[in-house]
Swiss-Prot record:
Keywords, alphabetical: Glycolysis, Isomerase, Manganese, Metal-binding
One GO term describing the cellular component: cytosol
Note describing how the cofactor binds: Binds 2 manganese ions per subunit.
Pathway(s) this gene product operates in, as recorded in its UniProt entry: Carbohydrate degradation; glycolysis; pyruvate from D-glyceraldehyde 3-phosphate: step 3/5
Xref: InterPro entries: Alkaline_phosphatase_core_sf, BPG-indep_PGM_N, Metalloenzyme, PGAM_B_sf, Pgm_bpd_ind
Chemical reaction(s) catalysed: (2R)-2-phosphoglycerate = (2R)-3-phosphoglycerate
Species of origin: Staphylococcus epidermidis (strain ATCC 35984 / DSM 28319 / BCRC 17069 / CCUG 31568 / BM 3577 / RP62A)
Subunit text: Monomer.
Annotated binding of Mn(2+) 2, by residue: D12, S62, D438, H439
Task performed by this protein: Catalyzes the interconversion of 2-phosphoglycerate and 3-phosphoglycerate.
Cofactor dependency: Mn(2+)
Protein name per the record: 2,3-bisphosphoglycerate-independent phosphoglycerate mutase
GO molecular-function terms, A-Z: manganese ion binding; phosphoglycerate mutase activity
């Protein structure tokens, strides 16, 4: 007899917001979501700031969201942890950072600092760059070259000049540091093995090849004149003493989120890299703020804090069969991040990865691979052996990042169609679904004056539990979702999970 599965369905980047203006969630025709919302118990939970282990007021993101969801507790994020280490001075005593400085001194070489130059807080924070500059100043090294990656996605599309000016003020104040190269994150921070993009960023950084400008500001302004926003700024070099990354140099990459920092790091550190032809740098000291992946051979500045008894581990220990399913863009989130930073499958776990479409930007194909994800899940449900399903629909977030209202509405409508088939099937099997999200985005894709808004929001996310006769708590946080799943599965919640079931008892 087929099992009665319990599913967690994450509509990525889908939150509650009162105003209809620029709100694709409100404007989309979503009869299935609305039907479940009217029929079943609902609540809303917090998905940003202190509730997910980020600084107060900081918007959530997919990595943070899935980690909190899977852990069933507040997970203090790298950003909060690094900020704290800078505030209490531990940062300046960090062994790896000081080893990088020592390497530069011993070799009479240069320190290169890579990272996303913004205060978006999703991948990095530019104040961490300032702390590295302060460390260099304290240690008396003068050749410090900053290779800045421009954001325009987690912050305003044209905000780079503000960060560049503040960084140049810091160079002057400390008497240390200069910009060496600048690239839009589209090139330097790809995560889909589009090596042609990475190659352009790499050539600017490593070989000092590319368009040349007298200053970082001049290069960005030239791009703006051609209607190129920060994310897409073509890699360029800044005139100065730097001549690229050379033998004996050191690199500190201050992005703390791994997924978009791994590829560039792999090019520099993995001798087996074959995405394009590279000349390896000899005697290079390469440090990354966190562990990016197993293909990156680097010293780790902030080692991972292990998370035990995440939802996947608890399912395994209770002999449950679980499925993780998503398309490429969100696959690491339902696997690695949901498992607390673990790549290996648990016993009884299987995974389905559906390829994301190969398009330049997802507004060109708002449905992405939602229908294929849905079909794959229906196929898995037909096997009748699943207890737990962890599913992500990427569309509201990935299309929401375009800052375009119509495609984002289409994205949500496509997901709603798929949601209906999936949830109805689970209910027909006697199972239950929790429909929710990991953070906001598609709830506001236009600013009040109709400019594209490509960032996440701090709005609370909806929760629908398709079980009649229960009452949900009025509020909660992402860390309460795993305990709610365990509640539906009648599985005891481990002590490490400090979240609380959203179901009132």
């Amino acid at each position: 007899m087929a099992k009665q599965p319990t599913a967690l369905i994450i509509l990525d980047g889908f939150a509650n917001r009162e105003s209809e203006h620029g709100n694709a969630v409100k404007q989309a025709h979503k009869p299935n979501f609305d039907r479940y919302y009217e029929k079943y118990p609902t609540t809303q939970i917090e998905a940003s700031g202190l509730d997910v282990g980020l600084p107060e007021g900081q918007m959530g993101n997919s990595e943070v969201g899935h980690m909190n969801i899977g852990a069933g507790r507040i997970v203090y994020q790298s950003l909060t942890r690094i900020n704290k280490s800078i505030e209490d001075g531990e940062f300046f005593d960090n062994t790896v950072l000081n080893n990088a400085v020592k390497h530069v001194k011993d070799n009479g070489s240069a320190l290169h600092v890579f990272g996303l130059l913004s205060d978006g807080g999703v991948h990095s924070h530019y104040k961490h760059l300032f702390a590295i500059l302060e460390l260099a100043k304290k240690q008396g090294i003068d050749k410090v070259y900053v290779h800045a990656f421009l954001d325009g996605r987690d912050v305003d599309q044209k905000s780079a000049l503000k960060y560049i000016e503040e960084t140049e003020d810091k160079f002057k104040e400390l008497g240390v540091g200069q910009f060496a190269s600048v690239s839009g994150r589209y090139y330097a921070m790809d995560r889909d093995k589009r090596w042609d993009r990475e190659e352009r960023a790499y050539n600017a950084i490593r070989n000092f090849e590319g368009p040349t400008f007298t200053s970082a500001k001049a290069g960005v302004e030239a791009n703006y004149k051609n209607d190129v926003t920060d994310e897409f700024v073509e890699p360029f070099i800044v005139e100065g003493q730097n001549d690229g990354v050379n033998d004996g140099d050191a690199v500190i990459f201050y992005n703390f989120r791994p997924d978009r920092a791994a590829q560039l790091s792999e090019i520099f550190t993995n001798k087996a890299f074959d995405g394009f032809k590279v000349e390896q740098v000899d005697n290079l000291f390469y440090a990354t703020f966190t562990k990016y992946n197993d293909n990156v051979d680097a010293e780790i500045v902030f080692e991972k804090v292990d998370l035990n008894n995440t939802i996947g581990e608890v399912a395994q220990d209770n002999g449950l069969k679980q499925l993780r399913i998503a398309e490429t863009e969100k696959y690491p989130h339902v696997t690695y991040f949901m498992s607390g930073g673990r790549n290996e499958e648990f016993e009884g776990e299987r995974r389905r990865l559906i390829d994301s479409p190969k398009v330049a930007t997802y507004d060109l194909k708002p449905e992405m691979s939602a229908y294929e994800v849905k079909d794959a899940l229906l196929e898995e449900l037909d096997k009748g052996d699943l207890d737990l399903i962890l599913l992500n629909f990427a569309n509201p977030d990935m299309v929401g990042h375009s800052g375009m209202l119509e495609p984002t509405i289409k994205a949500i409508e496509a997901v709603d169609e798929c949601l209906g088939e999936v949830v109805d099937k689970i209910i027909d099997m006697g199972g239950h679904a929790i429909i929710t999200a990991d953070h906001g985005n598609s709830d506001q894709v236009l600013t009040d004056d109709d400019q594209p808004m490509t960032t996440h929001t701090t709005n609370p996310v909806p929760v629908i539990v398709t079980k009649e006769g229960v009452t949900l708590r009025e509020t909660g946080r992402l860390g309460d979702l795993a305990p709610t799943l365990l509640d539906l599965l009648n599985v005891k919640q481990p002590s490490e999970m400090t979240g609380e079931s959203l179901i009132k008892h």
